[in-house]
Each structure stands twice: as structure tokens, then as C-alpha cells.
């Protein structure tokens, strides 16, 4: 089987992505019923490169490999020659001789692409400044579990046109739903990514207008990692874009609220929104584990029924 990478949602076909979502749900249900008895990754090793720290990403990938009988290696810039200037391609070629699959959480998407181009083993994007596709697998899985098929439905992104927003746009293309992106002027997502999605994506600047009749509402922090010095300015610019219980009241009666976490209560969301019955953020966070199990299984073993 040819080496497949998962750098954005566009690296898999819509049919493959739909299979992954259903497979993740099956894996989750099997774990609840039988415990971690399915171990297809025996003697397999995942190398995890972290330039950006994370709670959910590290724990979910390490646990996924442990449940499936494999092993995960944590590598920070201090642990590798990349931190001392070794070319990215050289590191990729070396690691491919030793491990079965690689996960990278970094700043530069171009650097990730350079690594994948030189790698003979699958590479997973666990977050770059441009995309966060693993989170979208968990998000669509959660939406599907809670509300059924997402095809033809309407999701709303409120906030910065950042890496999460870009992946939501790609998800609208691949899973065939409509997406309204609502942000302050000047914080729109990449124009080329929006254009590629065609009529599925609409840019708005009024949160109340954006959520009218929406099936799902989601958001993210106003200042991402590396943007801390912009926090004060962003708080001013995003005033009026906080997602609250009252804002959700203008969406569909059965609206679902998601947040990739960590959340800054009192900033992009009200202090109590995560506890609202319309929010499914804890289920969403837990689904990172199951969605990534399905992803690693697909990249190493192909389609498993």
C-alpha cells in the first residue's frame, strides 16, 4: 500500500472520511463494551513531534497507541537534532527507518509538508498554524453521534479565521454541509481556502445573523499560541463576538455547541456555556482518542470494516 499522509482533510476522499467517522464510533462502542482487547498495533511505534505543547493531543495519541497494543515516543525540539539544525528531510528519512508512523504538532505547515514529502511512513498533522484536521475528525464524529448525518446541515464558526476555521471550511467541502464564518472585519480566513469551498461557505460579521437557524455553533480562543502579544487588541476587536447561551437561543432548537478547547471562559464564551446542555465539549474532547485510533488504523492497515 502506498504511503498516505494526513496533513489536511483534503488528503482523504469524502468516502474515506465518512468511513473514518463511522469506524471511530464503532471503535468507541467496542472499547466501552469489551475494553481494550483489539490490539492491531502490536510492535508498532508512533513518533510524536511537539513544537507546540498540548494536553488533548499528547494524551489522546499516546492512549490510542497503548490501547491498540503499540507504543508512542514523545519528542520535543530539545530531544532531536531538528532543534540543532538538522534538515527536516534528513530527520524524516532517519525516523522512517525506525518508526511506523509520525505525528507532528508544529507552527509551519510548509515545514510539515517538507517532512511528509521525505517520509516513507505516514505523517499526521496534529496541528499547524494553518490547519487542525485531527480536531475536525473528533468534531464531526461528535456532531454525528449527537445529531445524525451532517450532510446538508448548517454549522457556524464564530471567531478568528484561524487554523481551526480553515479545517472547518475543508470539512464543509468533504462532508457536504454549509458553513457560516462569522468574524470581525480583518480576521477573515484565507481567501483561497474560502474560494475553494464555493457556495458551501459564507462570510458574515454579525453573530446574531450568523446563528439564525444553525444546527451547530463552534468557536475557538481569540488569540492562538504565538499570538499572546496580540491579546489586548484582539479582545477589543472581538468584543461582541462572544458565544453565550442567549446567542444560542437564536439558533435551531436542537443546536449543538462545540469548542476544541482549551477555552477561555469569559472571553470567546460566557463563563457558564460549557455547562449548558446544548454543549458537547467533553464528549468532543474524548472523541479525539477514538477518531485518532481510526485514523492511525486507516493509515497503517487501510480500510478496516
Swiss-Prot record:
It is found in: Cytoplasm. The keyword Protein transport does not apply. GO terms for biological process: arginine biosynthetic process via ornithine; citrulline biosynthetic process; L-arginine biosynthetic process. It holds the Pfam family OTCace_N. It comes from the Bacteria. One of its GO terms (molecular function) is ornithine carbamoyltransferase activity. SUPFAM superfamilies: Aspartate/ornithine carbamoyltransferase (SSF53671). It catalyses: carbamoyl phosphate + L-ornithine = L-citrulline + phosphate + H(+). It is an enzyme of class 2 (transferase). GO terms for cellular component: cytoplasm. Carbamoyl phosphate binds at residues 54-57, 81, 105, 132-135, 260-261, 288. L-ornithine binds at residues 163, 220, 224-225. InterPro entries: Asp/Orn_carbamoyltranf_P-bd, Asp/Orn_carbamoylTrfase, Asp/Orn_carbamoylTrfase_sf, Asp_carbamoyltransf_Asp/Orn-bd, Orn/put_carbamltrans, OTCase_ArgI. NCBIfam families: orni_carb_tr, PRK00779.1. Belongs to the aspartate/ornithine carbamoyltransferase superfamily. OTCase family. This is Ornithine carbamoyltransferase. The gene is argF.
